[in-house]
Structure formats: C-alpha cells, structure tokens
Amino acid sequence: MCNNNNTSCVNISSMLQPEDIFSRRCIWVNGPVIVGAGPSGLAVAADLKRQEVPFVILERANCIASLWQNRTYDRLKLHLPKQFCQLPNLPFPEDIPEYPTKYQFIEYLESYATHFDLRPKFNETVQSAKYDKRFGLWRVQTVLRSELLGYCEFEYICRWLVVATGENAEKVVPEFEGLEDFGGDVLHAGDYKSGERYRGKRVLVVGCGNSGMEVSLDLCNHDASPSMVVRSSVHVLPREVLGKSTFELSVTMMKWMPVWLVDKTLLVLTRLLLGNTDKYGLKRPEIGPLELKNTAGKTPVLDIGAISMIKSGKIKIVAGIAKFGPGKVELVDGRVLQIDSVILATGYRSNVPSWLKENDLGEIGIEKNPFPKGWKGKAGLYAVGFTGRGLSGASFDAMSVAHDIANSWKEETKQQIKTVATRHRRCISHF
C-alpha cells in the first residue's frame, strides 16, 4: 500500500478484527516506535539513525521538547553544567554559557533534530499500547488531530516499543479544602512564566523543590511577597562550590569515596556556604542528599539565590496548609495568611499508566529493575528518562537502548535475509 524510509504498510489483516480494518489505518514499522520527542526520545532516535535502524517517533504536541517549550518559566536555566545536559554525538556549541537558558537549550534540541534529520509525527497522541503475545509484536493505537486531515486513527505494529515520555508528562494538582472558595488566582508552576503579573501581590507558593524555590525567587525579583509552604525536610545545596559545579564535584568524589562520605563532605561545605538552614524553617533529612536521591528518588535543591532571600525575610517559610478560605489560607500551625494568589509547585507525574496496558512499565521501573538495567523491560519494551538521573542519565540510557535495539534489529534482519535466500535457492533447484 505505501512505503517510506521509516514505515511501510503491509498485509497484517491476520492481526486485525474486521471492524479495525475500516476504523483505522494500520502501519507496520520495521524498527521501534518511540513515544515522545523530548530529549530522551531524540537521543534514542539519533543513535538509531547513526546505526541505520528505521524508527518512528510519535509526539502528542506540535513541537519537539514540548514540556520545555510550553511548561517552563522564562528565567529558567539548566541547573547543571552543559556538558552534563548535552545529548549523545552532538555537544553544545562552544559559545553557549556553562548554564544554558531554557531558550538556548530548546534551540540546541531543535538543531539536534535538524542535524540528525529527525522527523517526529506531531499532534499524534498514543491512546494505548499493548503487546500481542500471539504474534510477538506491539500494537500502538494513536489519534491524529490536524487542520489538514482532521481526526484520524492509526495503529502502529512494531517489534520494539520505546517509552520516552519522561516522568513529568502530567501536572500533579493536590486537592485542598476550601480552594474553590479562595476566589484568587490559582496557577500550577507548569503554567507560570514570570512574576511580572504578581507585582505587589501576596503569593502562596506550595512546594519547596527546585521549582518552588525558583518561582519564589522570581516573585521576589518582581516585587511580589511570596510565602513558601514547606511540609517536609529538604536538602538545599549550593549550585557551585568554590567555582566548581556541586554536581561535578559530587561525580568526581564518587569515583574515590563511598556515598556516605561524599554526603558528609557536601553537607560540611554547604554549612560553610549557606549556613544552618534549619533555623530558617528548612530542616534537613537525616539521610544524606545523594543517598536520599538513590534510595527515594528525591532530588536536592540547588540554590541560585533563594536562600539569601529567605534569610532576609523576603521569602517567608510557612507550615503546611489546613484549608483555604476567601482571600486567605489557614496553616496547620494555626496561623492565617491573607493572600492574593496561589502557585502550585507540586510537581509532575508520568502519564504512561493511562496508555501502556497491563502496567508493563512496572517491569522496567527503578524499583524492580534498578540501574544500570532500568531501561530494559520484556518483549522489546524499553524506557528512557525514568531512572531519576536527569538529562545525563537519560542520555546514557538512550545510548544503551539504541545499541540493544540495533543489535536485535540487525540480527533479525540477517535471519530474514537467510530465510529469503534459502527459499530462493529452493525455487531455483525446482525450476
């Protein structure tokens, strides 16, 4: 029916119910289907391209790296030096600063896609992905919405499935008593762009992770009055120690020292640079920052100026929320704050359980299959960007996934060629 570099429509009617033939187009992919055109998906695709393995990238948005383009605030910079955030086989340009802005990172990702000629199928949302045990193949059902074609349904049939949607696909919005009666502006941090609209306002920031800290700092810089809700203990580290990235310093020390000693060293240096954060309402966990990251996946906050604002009182630390009322919030310690706006820096979660049937991703997850094999599941299922190790970890996983798929693809292709050659010889011998 049709053929191109990445996909070919073939006769697979034996896999379909009669109603499927008329309700959706079925496409055979002679390689993996990659779900997600963010950094993880692009990295896998580029390495597959380099090894001449065909693939298809499915992306629900109308652009690559949609979370970076649509759900990040204007002042955002990468928290780690650029060498730890670049994707495989194409470094950042030399003129990019050590900590690129979000715009520089997006431009880098777009140039990465152009360099490797990666062409995702945009506006195509995966509805379900299920492994067909009878045929040993994945069935990925999608919906395409476009001005040109309107509403179309597709089913991709493939041997390998790469889940690269990441852990931040959907916003986490907790329920709070009385929030519907608050009457003021309520926004998730994923929709926050700048503090300009909050100038002169009293803003409650719910959450004290990296997003909560940066939003609070940005609000201060725009003459707003932020109060940050801190419900649990948190590790705050300086972004740099004596001009060297804290992350890079940690990586270097980990080569020679056990985790507990690296943690001890980091906390001593942090105490010298930031002081005792406990007295400002930021209590530290009993477990060290790296051990906590490894065991619970909780990332430490890298300070870029919020701590000095907390010390000066410009950012106020407050207890957990009891309930909201009209124009106010009551805290668990009994205090009542009059506020104008609420920003929910309450994080994100994966949307994979909603479309990957039978919760197959659980077979890959860090809990059941820890690093370094956390990227590989069963029956040709792979995941990139789910091991909680940021962009550097995702790039490492991407290369592992691409290499593993390429080896399988080349072996299966070789076997198919042998089978065809054997049949051809038989035809000649009977001629």
From Swiss-Prot:
Residue positions binding NADP(+): 207-212
Keyword Oxidoreductase on entry: yes
Coiled-coil region: none
InterPro entries, per the entry: Auxin_biosynth/cation_transpt, FAD/NAD-bd_sf, Flavin_mOase-like
Disruption phenotype: No visible phenotype, due to the redundancy with the other members of the YUCCA family.
Gene3D superfamilies: FAD/NAD(P)-binding domain
The EC number(s) this enzyme carries: 1.14.13.168
Keywords: Auxin biosynthesis, FAD, Flavoprotein, Monooxygenase, NADP, Oxidoreductase
Pathway given in the UniProt record: Plant hormone metabolism; auxin biosynthesis
Residues the record lists as binding FAD: 36-41
Keyword Mitochondrion (UniProt): no
Pfam families hit by this protein: FMO-like
Catalytic reaction equation(s): indole-3-pyruvate + NADPH + O2 + H(+) = (indol-3-yl)acetate + CO2 + NADP(+) + H2O
UniProt note on tissues of expression: Expressed in shoot apex regions and siliques, and at high levels in roots. Detected in flowers, stems and leaves.
GO molecular function annotation: flavin adenine dinucleotide binding; indole-3-pyruvate monooxygenase activity; N,N-dimethylaniline monooxygenase activity; NADP binding
Any one Gene Ontology BP term: response to water deprivation
Induction: Up-regulated by drought and by abscisic acid.
Cofactor: FAD
Highest taxon in the source lineage: Eukaryota
UniProt xrefs under PANTHER family: FLAVIN-BINDING MONOOXYGENASE-LIKE PROTEIN (AFU_ORTHOLOGUE AFUA_4G09220), INDOLE-3-PYRUVATE MONOOXYGENASE YUCCA7-RELATED
Function description: Involved in auxin biosynthesis. Belongs to the set of redundant YUCCA genes probably responsible for auxin biosynthesis in roots.
Family per record: Belongs to the FMO family.
Protein name per its UniProtKB record: Probable indole-3-pyruvate monooxygenase YUCCA7
Organism expressing this protein natively: Arabidopsis thaliana
